[in-house]
């Protein structure tokens, strides 16, 4: 929300998924970027302990993903670009979330985002964890802040599973190649956003300034492209990420 408040104006939040409830870990609403109407999606981790618990430490429930998708379809109906901000360790894996269809909600977002007929941009501002992050990041442009990370599992979780030793988190992080430069080299993101010295958390205004410039540049490029080409290239990009090769 720090970025939304500093980069956009006239943010008007939309609540609820019209099916179960309103997930406070996910915020969606219409806003203006340099006067242009856009849909903004962001997740909230909370500040105080009480606030973090209320927002589930930033981990969305199914209703959070469904709320985001409902808003994306509204944006598509009115021809508004979609910009999402992601900083979450993953989707919430609790029993209630599974009973309400967490896997289906994530899969549905992946499908629908891949064919949205509006320009889409996703920004990973801190941590982008697994399918929970990808469910908000199937976009024409995926940006990654210079000090952010993008992974299929946290290094601690990987170390615990692979070696049964969470203290080997640095070994896991190195093997997983989760830094901005490494993720970009793998073709998983389209651009790295420069941060102020010490990181954006030390100077939110400067960090928002850097990111705002990038958003305007990429949005202008996307809006100059034919819609059929946008959708085709978006789908091709994510299919190519999934390709791998082996040597016999």
Regions found by a protein language model. Name each.
Residues 1-160, 164-167, 174-248:
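Terminal-region recognition feature
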């Amino acid at each position: 929300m720090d970025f939304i408040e500093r980069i956009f104006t006239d943010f008007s939040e939309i609540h609820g998924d019209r099916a179960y409830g309103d997930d406070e870990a996910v915020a969606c609403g219409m806003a203006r970027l340099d006067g242009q109407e856009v849909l903004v999606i962001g997740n909230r981790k909370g500040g105080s302990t009480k606030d973090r618990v209320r927002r589930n430490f930033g981990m969305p429930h199914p209703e959070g993903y469904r709320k985001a998708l409902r808003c994306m379809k509204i944006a598509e109906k009115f021809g508004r670009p979609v910009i999402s901000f992601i900083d979450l360790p993953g989707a919430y894996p609790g029993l209630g979330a599974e009973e309400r269809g967490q896997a289906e909600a994530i899969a549905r977002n992946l499908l629908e985002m891949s064919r949205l007929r509006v320009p889409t941009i996703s920004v990973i501002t801190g941590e982008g964890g697994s399918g929970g992050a990808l469910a908000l990041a199937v976009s024409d442009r995926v940006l990654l802040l210079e000090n952010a990370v993008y992974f299929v599992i946290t290094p601690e979780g990987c170390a615990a599973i692979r070696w049964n030793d969470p203290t080997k988190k640095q070994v896991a992080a190195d093997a997983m190649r989760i830094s901005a430069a490494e993720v970009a080299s793998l073709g998983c993101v389209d651009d790295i956003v420069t941060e102020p010295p010490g990181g954006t958390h030390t100077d939110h205004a400067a960090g928002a300034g850097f990111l705002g410039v990038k958003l305007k540049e990429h949005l202008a490029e996307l809006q100059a492209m034919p819609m059929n080409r946008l959708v085709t290239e978006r789908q091709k990009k994510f299919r190519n990420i999934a390709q791998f090769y082996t040597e016999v």
